[in-house]
């Protein structure tokens, strides 16, 4: 279930995802503007991608730091990687958007 649907349907209450800090950059735009619709990555996906790929944490450590399960981190990282690849190979802009996550500083 997408996090933006929080509270709009029945089922288990979604847990909050802890973000260690806001990214310094909110968007990456290709040099020759293509005019295509940008790809939106939410803060949870960006945080999971940063922890696993940039800081080279294991999925277990990243899950503990974010306060979610290892499977959730795996889904977030895969979604972020797919969106990043789409943006790079189609020449789209990448936007980092908020999605209702808590911020732990």
From Swiss-Prot:
A Pfam family this chain is assigned to: DUF134
Top-level taxon in the UniProt lineage: Archaea
SUPFAM superfamilies: Sigma3 and sigma4 domains of RNA polymerase sigma factors (SSF88659)
Alphabetical list of InterPro entries matching this protein: RNA_pol_sigma_r3/r4-like, UPF0251, WH-like_DNA-bd_sf
Transmembrane segments: none
Family: Belongs to the UPF0251 family.
Name of the protein in question: UPF0251 protein AF_0666
């Amino acid at each position: 279930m997408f996090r933006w649907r929080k509270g709009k349907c029945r089922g288990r209450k979604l847990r909050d995802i802890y973000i260690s800090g806001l990214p310094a950059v909110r968007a990456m735009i290709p040099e020759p503007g293509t005019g295509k619709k940008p790809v939106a990555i939410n803060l949870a996906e960006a945080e999971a991608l940063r922890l696993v790929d940039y800081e080279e944490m294991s999925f277990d450590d990243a899950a503990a730091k974010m306060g979610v399960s290892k499977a959730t981190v795996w889904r977030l990282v895969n979604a972020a990687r797919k969106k990043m690849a789409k943006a790079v190979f189609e020449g789209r802009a990448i936007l980092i958007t908020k999605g209702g996550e808590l911020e732990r500083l």
